[in-house]
């Protein structure tokens, strides 16, 4: 399947690496309003470059696009792609409000095209094992389900682009931008959220409109309770791993980035031996805790391969727009709660 990239910034480069490495896809073209940026990325991968989106989408060989523009600028290029008859994979968040996401979903349905998201933290062996355990009910009655994203961003990060730290284009701060993948993982594992209560604050950065620290209490539909803590002002030399922790009456599993800190179940299975020997080796450095460029592209690769396979098989991908909508719904509810003095908001 021939891919086109919309947005030749940092994320566009990750997309290009993933597309080049994947099975079932090749990079056909790159679009960016900045012709120089489009030329540079396209030249590196032997693709065509465009600075006119209509000309980019008019390419008959182009079948699917990835969208890596700023978060609050996903709507227009994705709508254009869907209406031009292209499938679309959109970076996180799918969009920054539920009405915008619903508009995209309607356009995909009307044009008979697949709309999917980049939910790349779902695609590694640790998450595969975690999801299997959750689906098999190995935790018993789930009591606790929490996510902790204690990351750090220098002031220079926010100053590097005018859209960073704005409601209009970033959609939020530490929670919406840095933490959405981990929030998605929490919902993916623990199930639907019933209500949230939250507080947010900007503690350590200037010239931003949004939060750099957030704490939310979460109530799940299954009765479990938990916490989401998201920050870009918690420094550590090597960076704190993003953590997802589930615990219930029959078991507990604590995941730190891609490795387990705890994997303990009342009823052990043969697979637990392998999981403990291969997936409990300490957290892998360089997953974006301190440096947003220090992430690998392999999870993006698996994400893209899953979407292509779903299209070829005539099914919805596991990272469908419906799935991507869930984390944005929870995050926007958290913001609503924080803006109303911690009022309980039902999702």
Language-model regions, residue ranges each:
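Beta-strand-loop-alpha-helix segment that lines the small-molecule cofactor/substrate pocket
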Residues: 64-71, 75-122, 137
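N-terminal Rossmann-like dinucleotide-binding module
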Residues: 1-45
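C-terminal helix-rich "cap/oligomerization" subdomain common to oxidoreductases
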Residues: 64-67, 102, 113, 221, ...
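C-terminal glycine/acidic-rich active-site capping loop/insertion
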Residues: 220, 243-322, 343-347
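Conserved SAM-binding strand-loop segment of SAM-dependent methyltransferases
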Residues: 47-53
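Predominantly a Rossmann-like dinucleotide-binding segment in NAD(P)-dependent oxidoreductases
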Residues: 121-208, 341
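Contiguous beta-strand/loop segments that form the cofactor/metal-binding neighborhood of enzyme cores
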Residues: 183-263, 301-313
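Hydrophobic residues in well-ordered beta-strands that form the structural core
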Residues: 51, 90-91, 115-117, 228, ...
